[in-house]
Amino acid sequence: MNTKVVLIMLMITSVILVVEAETLFTANCLDRKDCKKHCKSKGCKEMKCEQIIKPTWRCLCIMCSK
């Protein structure tokens, strides 16, 4: 009985960790450097910048720690 409870708790913990690893933050930035600073401050491992309209950039920060 105790081993089943421990296994269930481990499975729940692993699901929570996977969800946190895939956390995504978006923000509007002025340029790529601003985007890089924003993602770094959130503790993100990856970033992607895309230009929405000429002066505006959208920053996608991927795999962030909370």
UniProtKB/Swiss-Prot annotation:
Tissue expr: Expressed by the venom gland.
Keyword Disulfide bond among record annotations: yes
GO molecular function terms noted in the UniProt entry: potassium channel regulator activity; toxin activity
Location(s) in or outside the cell: Secreted
Disulphide bonds in the chain: C29-C49, C35-C59, C39-C61, C44-C64
Keyword Disulfide bond: yes
One cellular component (GO) term of this entry: extracellular region
Main location group: secreted
Family: Belongs to the short scorpion toxin superfamily. Potassium channel inhibitor family.
Physiological role: Blocks voltage-gated potassium channels.
Protein known as: Potassium channel toxin alpha-KTx
Organism: Hoffmannihadrurus gertschi
Classification of source organism: Eukaryota, Metazoa, Ecdysozoa, Arthropoda, Chelicerata
